[in-house]
Amino acid sequence: MSLSIDVTSLPSISSSIYKNESSSTTSTLSGKSIGRSEQYISPDAEAFSKYMLSKSPEDIGPSDSASNDPLTSFSIRSNAVKTNADAGVSMDSLTQSRPSSNVGCDQVDFSLNKGIKVSANLDSSVSISTNVKKEKSKNDHRSRKHYPKIEAESDSDDYVLDDSDSDDGKCKNCKYKRKYFALRMRMKQVAMQLIEDL
């Protein structure tokens, strides 16, 4: 599977990406001015330009190329356009003069072993603090634990109930009756205070 992109408005670079090939480096760099400057022009570029301009495109043969490869020379012949001496050799001809197959076309091939692999790691952390401190003064804390003190020796008749409220007559007129009812009333008040605190 290959992807070819030809941009005619820019310096005509088309790229083909081939998958599952043996080489992972750039295998071929050929074609127009970029390829010519690396493969076809001899160290004396000016002399080579004048030599190529002196011949018509039909007269260019394999011996005129830096390579004797027939496909390379065919690519030179099919893309050569005669220009003035100042512009040098131009291979920027129209697309119609190129061969129909990809072989010999102006292209930059990138051969990849396993295609393109993109690995991205996104690390993120979210910290939410829900600690709410309730400020309590020591005085409030102590006042909640302060319960009313009831004297067991109180002479108040409010703590003394009739015999029907006693434990089925088990505590009739005993000497601990007043202390018992005082303790029971205190326990009720403690229970009521606990309920209010909750």
From Swiss-Prot:
Q: From the UniProt entry, list the residue stretches annotated as the region Disordered.
A: 16-37, 53-72, 131-151
Residues at which Mg(2+) binds: 92
**Entry keyword annotation includes Transport:** no
Q: Where in the cell is it found?
A: Host cytoplasm
- Pfam family of this protein, just one? Rota_NS26
Consult the record and explain the modifications the protein receives after translation.
Hyperphosphorylated on serine residues, when in dimeric form. Ser-67 phosphorylation by CK1 is required for the hyperphosphorylation of NSP5 dimer. Impaired phosphorylation is associated with a profound morphological change in virus factories and a moderate decrease in virus replication. O-glycosylated.
The keyword Metal-binding is annotated on this UniProt entry: yes
**One biological process term in Gene Ontology:** viral genome replication
* Main localization category: host cell
Keywords tagged on the record: Glycoprotein, Host cytoplasm, Magnesium, Metal-binding, Nucleotide-binding, Phosphoprotein, RNA-binding
Cofactor(s) demanded: Mg(2+)
Q: Where is the composition biased (Low complexity)?
A: 16-30
Family statement: Belongs to the rotavirus NSP5 family.
Show the HAMAP family listed in the entry.
ROTA_NSP5
Subunit arrangement?
Answer: Homodimer. Interacts with VP1. Interacts with VP2. Interacts with NSP2; this interaction leads to up-regulation of NSP5 hyperphosphorylation and formation of virus factories. Interacts with NSP6. Participates in the selective exclusion of host proteins from stress granules (SG) and P bodies (PB). Also participates in the sequestration of these remodeled organelles in viral factories.
Q: What does this protein do?
A: Plays an essential role in the viral genome replication. Participates, together with NSP2, in the formation of viral factories (viroplasms), which are large inclusions in the host cytoplasm where replication intermediates are assembled and viral RNA replication takes place. Orchestrates the recruitment of viroplasmic proteins such as capsid proteins to these factories. Participates in the selective exclusion of host proteins from stress granules (SG) and P bodies (PB). Also participates in the sequestration of these remodeled organelles in viral factories.
Name the chain's protein: Non-structural protein 5
Species this chain originates from: Rotavirus A (strain RVA/Human/Japan/AU-1/1982/G3P3[9]) (RV-A)
